[in-house]
């Protein structure tokens, strides 16, 4: 049986559960796919050229995580779907000898929310994940605000129609989303007292990090604010990516079931 290689680019990457859940799917669906896929973590030096690495490794597809999603958008031969709007790519697939970029973070995040009636969201951070979330939440009719410590990247959100801030707005929000990398450094993304104010009035504190109780989620728990980590988003975006890797042979709900069973 033919072997195909896949992977996930990131820095850091050792924490990633993507290899675990994707390899479970490649093993489960190898008969339907007609090939055996192997998916591995790829630690990419910060100055690396993603496309060169992708081609050098002979990959058929890959995911892209922190801090490369915006850079991945720049190197694709073609961009499809909501990735065109959000300027960030987390899924790379070879289609007809072209490197095609998708974004499955956006829909993956929305599916992970479970269709609750949220009306407003505050996104902390302005990177590739924040862009994808802002695009999807706007599309779903929510009022989206973005808070970032610097002006870097905020022009994108302004063009999108989000309210943008460098100082914490004195407002209330249904969703407070940590899309920064602060949790990976075991830090809060924002002043503790300011966060407390948002959590007390909010309906859900959501951290894109997963696998441990982050300082952000710990504070929400302390205040008895409903909270959620990024595990379900990870699995949904991975299942949506797997659908792309399988050339739509394996619909994402089937992939999701397998991935959920191992993580």
Curated annotation (Swiss-Prot):
Transmembrane segments: none annotated. CDD domains: NAD_bind_Shikimate_DH. Involved in the biosynthesis of the chorismate, which leads to the biosynthesis of aromatic amino acids. Catalyzes the reversible NADPH linked reduction of 3-dehydroshikimate (DHSA) to yield shikimate (SA). It can also use NAD to oxidize shikimate. Inhibited by curcumin, 3-(2-naphthyloxy)-4-oxo-2-(trifluoromethyl)-4H-chromen-7-yl 3-chlorobenzoate, butyl 2-{[3-(2-naphthyloxy)-4-oxo-2-(trifluoromethyl)-4H-chromen-7-yl]oxy}propanoate, 2-({2-[(2-{[2-(2,3-dimethylanilino)-2-oxoethyl]sulfanyl}-1,3-benzothiazol-6-yl)amino]-2-oxoethyl}sulfanyl)-N-(2-naphthyl)acetamide, and maesaquinone diacetate. The lineage of its organism: Bacteria, Pseudomonadati, Campylobacterota, Epsilonproteobacteria, Campylobacterales. Optimum pH is between 8 and 9. It catalyses: shikimate + NADP(+) = 3-dehydroshikimate + NADPH + H(+). It comes from Helicobacter pylori. This is Shikimate dehydrogenase (NADP(+)). HAMAP family: Shikimate_DH_AroE.
């Amino acid at each position: 049986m033919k072997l195909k290689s896949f992977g996930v680019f990131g820095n850091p990457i050792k924490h990633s559960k993507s290899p675990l859940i994707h390899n479970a799917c490649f093993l489960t669906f190898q008969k339907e796919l007609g090939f055996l896929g192997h998916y591995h973590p790829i630690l990419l030096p910060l100055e690396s050229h993603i496309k060169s690495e992708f081609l050098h490794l002979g990959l058929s597809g890959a995911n892209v995580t922190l801090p490369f999603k915006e850079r991945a958008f720049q190197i694709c031969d073609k961009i499809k779907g909501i990735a065109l709007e959000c300027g960030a790519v987390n899924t790379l697939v070879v289609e007809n000898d072209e490197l095609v970029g998708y974004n499955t973070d956006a829909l993956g995040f929305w599916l992970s929310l479970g269709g609750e009636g949220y009306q407003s969201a505050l996104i902390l951070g302005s990177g590739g994940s924040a862009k994808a979330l802002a695009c999807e939440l706007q599309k779903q009719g929510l009022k989206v605000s973005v808070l970032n410590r610097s002006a870097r990247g905020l022009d994108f959100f302004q063009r999108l129609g989000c309210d943008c801030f460098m100082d914490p707005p004195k407002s209330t929000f249904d969703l407070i989303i940590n899309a920064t990398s602060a949790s990976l450094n075991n830090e809060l993304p924002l002043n503790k007292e300011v966060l407390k104010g948002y959590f007390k009035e909010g309906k859900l504190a959501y951290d894109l990090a997963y696998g441990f109780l982050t300082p952000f989620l710990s504070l929400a728990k302390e205040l008895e604010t409903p909270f959620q980590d990024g595990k379900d988003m990870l699995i949904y975006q991975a299942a949506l990516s797997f659908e792309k890797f399988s050339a739509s042979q394996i619909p994402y709900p089937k992939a999701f079931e397998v991935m959920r069973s191992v993580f």
